[in-house]
From Swiss-Prot:
This is Low specificity L-threonine aldolase. Keywords: Lyase, Pyridoxal phosphate. InterPro entries: ArAA_b-elim_lyase/Thr_aldolase (IPR001597), Low_specificity_L-TA_bact (IPR026273), PyrdxlP-dep_Trfase (IPR015424), PyrdxlP-dep_Trfase_major (IPR015421), PyrdxlP-dep_Trfase_small (IPR015422). It is an enzyme of class 4 (lyase). The modification N6-(pyridoxal phosphate)lysine is found at K207. The lineage of its organism: Bacteria, Pseudomonadati, Pseudomonadota, Gammaproteobacteria, Pseudomonadales. Its cofactor is pyridoxal 5'-phosphate. The keyword Lyase applies. Pfam families: Beta_elim_lyase (PF01212). One of its GO terms (biological process) is threonine catabolic process. It catalyses: L-threonine = acetaldehyde + glycine; L-allo-threonine = acetaldehyde + glycine. The keyword Lyase applies.
Length: 346
């Protein structure tokens, strides 16, 4: 039976996947040591090292804003700057947290191509000024998959990494939808991270079947010095850390993280296919992850809302974002597509 509560405004609307829920229930049996000194945190960390094929440093935070902000703060000083895209979550949706936790590191906005930074755009910003009056560029942060649903290929990441190394910049990846990027490309997590030159990855779980929690992976272990103190100071050291870590065990041990991301991606592609022939509807960006960005008429947008659909319209006049989730019902996708056809007069 179709779940009519399902919406497409955000993949944060979805609930908790069975694997994460079961792991939390198992972790709830009896007592465990506190503050991350427990078997679940150790197991989750080891699963990440196995998955990424490297001995990375692993930390856990409650949400993506904290993960990104603390990771960036570890990579630069207050007089440094961070190069990001104009649509980056750290720029538009984190309430100044990256600047706050870094004691003032400035975000410098670079131009993008279909939501993605390029070596040229990074170079333009990094070399724009090199005098002492300008915040010294120190970090590049990119989002995988991007805020507009596009995905960096390994060669693109390697080219960006090479530019970063040439210019003395660290490379941070906001991986709120990293799982969706892996599922789309069929690449291993290692190929899309440290093997492509990424220093630090914030791996998102909340948008892919978990209740709360992101993992921060330092592939360059030297950059993780005293990071546990940063987490504690920022209120990110959970006393019962096992309940942040256990869901990761649940989703990682049998590759549920990848299956669910692939399902969300397939639902997004289905939606795009079902409305591809509707007059007046066009894709704003390629559908590569779990988001569909459609150009619609303003009356159609209002008509969809009047029919009870929830979605975001922060991407310009007539632009609408529809996000699919780990548990999106295929029939619900078809219902949305039918209503889009209806309100567009098709």
């Amino acid at each position: 039976m179709t779940d009519h509560t399902q919406q497409f405004a955000s993949d944060n609307y979805s609930g908790i996947c069975p694997e994460a829920w079961a792991a939390m229930a198992e972790a709830n049996r009896g007592h465990e040591r506190a503050y991350g000194d427990d078997q679940w945190t150790a197991r989750a960390s080891d699963y990440f090292r196995q998955l990424f094929e490297t001995d990375c440093e692993v930390f856990f935070a409650f949400n993506g804003t904290a993960a990104n902000s603390l990771a960036l703060a570890a990579l630069c000083q207050s007089y440094h700057s961070v190069i990001c895209s104009e649509t980056a979550h750290v720029e538009t949706d984190e309430c100044g947290a990256p600047e706050f936790f870094s004691n003032g590191s400035k975000l410098l906005l670079a131009q993008t191509e279909v939501g993605k930074l390029t070596p040229a755009s990074i170079r333009d910003i990094a070399l724009k000024r090199q005098d002492i009056h300008y915040p010294k560029p120190r970090v590049v942060t990119l989002t995988q998959a991007t805020e507009v649903g596009t995905v960096y290929r390994p060669d693109e990441l390697k080219a960006i990494s090479a530019t970063c190394k040439e210019l003395g910049l660290h490379l941070h990846m906001d991986g709120a939808r990293f799982s969706n990027a892996c599922a789309f490309l069929g690449c291993s997590p290692a190929e899309l991270s440290w093997k492509a030159g990424v220093d630090v990855l914030c791996f998102g779980g909340t948008k892919n079947g978990m209740a709360v929690g992101e993992a921060i992976l330092f592939f360059n272990r030297d950059l993780a010095e005293d990071f546990d103190y940063r987490c504690k100071q920022a209120g990110q050291l959970a006393s019962k850390m096992r309940f942040l870590a256990a869901p990761w065990v649940g989703v990682l041990q049998d590759d549920a993280w990848l299956r669910y991301a692939d399902h969300a991606n397939r639902c997004a592609r289905l939606l795009a296919e079902l409305v591809a022939d509707v007059p007046g509807v066009s894709l704003m960006f390629p559908v590569e992850a779990n988001g569909v960005f459609l150009q619609l008429s303003e009356p159609a947008i209002e008509a969809l809302r009047a029919r009870g659909w929830r979605f975001y319209t922060f991407i310009g006049e007539g632009g609408a974002r529809f996000m699919c989730s780990w548990d999106t019902d295929i029939e619900r996708v078809r219902e949305l597509a039918r209503d889009i056809r209806l309100v567009m007069g098709a």
